[in-house]
């Protein structure tokens, strides 16, 4: 979510003080009739309770309440201590089972089962209504819901990881060693959709090899995809997308992947030049040029990543810079994040600052790589001399204040990253797709950038001393933000789909235990204690039970 949108909304709110604030449902002041109706609707439950008490008091004589209470008291006085032991023991067992179920449901779904059932089923039966006064079909309500839905969808947008690993040379080798699958089906399905978007077009039927590859990208079974790629190469030895698939999924080393990508580059450049010559003939040829451009950019980018992994970092930087100059419209691929990581490896901090000056703009989307790299550069100037004792005694210098503010900005954007940088949580292989501001983005960033933070002396120490201060600045992160939009509430669900099951997903903000978990825990403990005391001291507990029943009877008789 861009900072520009945030400041634009703030400017509009300041410039139009009498206009309703979007998303909050604020409008013109209500009349006395509307306020009376709203007050009666809110006090309905209280009125019903008072009416019930009045009716009970009026019918106390016809219903012979005193006689009934006397009979109940006599019945309770005749019960033996064994009955109370059995009763409290059964109550403790039932409440314990409810407590265990509530705890399991909360950890799995993040909400209370009793609370959810109460809101979904019991509240409508008891006459509960929505707090909004607008009619469901009113234009204001529809516009508000449309705005909220659009904001929710933009928050939960999944992005392709610009530093994603190779399936054959990295992900599969991890599976061979550990026996664990690092990618989820949801993540791989998103990659299949990306491949169909990047590598296919409506003119594929004109070339048999492209028709075969179109089916290959839709195939879920990796051996079947690899087999289809070889079939496409038999039909056309210059099928670039077939080499791409083999480099991604069949190659078991980065060296093999680079060799296949170089073959794909030769074939892709031939097809790209041919498409450039025919692009103005028809809309179909323009679509074919866009597809061939995507293929060429993808191949060059992966070649740059191969060079980076093989230690030829300057070569990787050159390829990335050439890509960004030759294809500037393709900024949505976030090639600048690959460039930032490679420049940090070269310790070319001036070049890193130049890239940040271009992409850390108020009108451009942010990412953890941009925010935390900006914080790292400001931390680098003061981290070697930073001391918590000196800062506490003399205060922070201007440079230290700037570094701390940059850390707070980065932590507000993605609060999950510090735990991985400080090695408070173990890292896993990053997924192929990430959710910005989520745990998946934090893993992807820390996996590649942890070494850069360790290289700068004192950087992690300054981060450890200051990052938690962000949460004091934003006490209610889901309701309001400081420099960015409020933290989205959908990240946990999306991250659970993107990350493997053996990883414990980081959740922000930490969810408080629901009331019913505390209630059932207290009920279970108290009834178990009563059962134990009744079993150990039956006479004393019998006297206590009779005293409670007598007090209850006295209260009813007084009424």
Curated annotation (Swiss-Prot):
Compartment(s): Membrane
Lipid bilayer topology: Multi-pass membrane protein
GO biological process: negative regulation of cell growth
Record key words, sorted: Membrane, Transmembrane, Transmembrane helix
Sequence intervals crossing the membrane: 39-59, 83-103, 513-533
Coiled-coil spans in chain: none
InterPro entries the record matches: ST7 (IPR007311)
Tissue spec. comment: Ubiquitously expressed.
One term under GO cellular component: membrane
Source organism, top-level taxon: Eukaryota
Family, similarity comment: Belongs to the ST7 family.
Protein name: Suppressor of tumorigenicity 7 protein-like
Species: Mus musculus (Mouse)
Encoding gene (name): St7l
